[in-house]
């Protein structure tokens, strides 16, 4: 009824069989989708849901487009045709849309999950991608503790003897302000769900 005060929040609702992810802007506007069964989603600190019909099960308020038009955030290329609407572009601050900090987070999360390089220029920043191998707890731990080791994204921002947690120009997935990291292994019986926690930076403390 009252809307949402802070801007830029994300929530995941999941059980053993399915997961829904929602991205909220300030007020009453949001977009959400069910993650397809064969897909993996990597959501950094930015919106990455885009079109109105990208996925079979999507959720958004009836005025998500008209509100963006009224605020001057979106102008359809063809009057009355909203096929080019992009939620992430319209509802995100211009300097945050494809901002390098969060692009690197998503890019490197996908790189680890898929075990291959991810090209932002060619493949974009999708909400989710088709998984090419099983998702394991170890894979998730590798993603959540990553400073992009072995890539140019890592080496360009801190030198020998310095900590990646102190890098001022980039925020890694595991970063200086990481206070806790959690992995959830969901079961058919909710009471058997496993939560693995690293009470600090996961690159330094075990789950």
Where does each model-flagged region fall?
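C-terminus-biased signal that marks the final domain/tail of proteins
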Residues: 2-23, 27-207
């Amino acid at each position: 009824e009252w809307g949402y005060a802070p801007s830029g929040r994300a929530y995941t609702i999941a059980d053993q069989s399915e997961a829904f992810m929602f991205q909220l802007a300030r007020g009453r506007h949001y977009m959400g989708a069910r993650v397809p069964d064969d897909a993996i989603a990597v959501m950094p600190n930015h919106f990455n849901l885009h079109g109105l019909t990208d996925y079979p099960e999507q959720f958004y308020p009836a005025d998500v487009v008209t509100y963006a038009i009224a605020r001057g955030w979106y102008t359809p290329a063809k009057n009355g045709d909203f096929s080019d609407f992009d939620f992430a572009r319209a509802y995100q601050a211009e300097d945050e849309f494809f901002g390098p900090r969060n692009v690197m987070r998503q890019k490197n999360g996908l790189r680890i999950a898929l075990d291959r390089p991810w090209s932002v220029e060619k493949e974009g920043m999708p909400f989710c991608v088709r998984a090419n191998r099983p998702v394991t707890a170890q894979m998730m731990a590798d993603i959540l503790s990553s400073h992009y080791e072995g890539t140019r994204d890592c080496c360009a921002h801190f030198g020998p003897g310095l900590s990646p947690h102190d890098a001022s120009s980039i925020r890694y997935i595991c970063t200086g302000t990481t206070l806790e990291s959690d992995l959830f292994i969901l079961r058919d019986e909710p009471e058997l769900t496993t939560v693995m926690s690293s009470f600090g930076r996961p690159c330094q403390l075990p789950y």
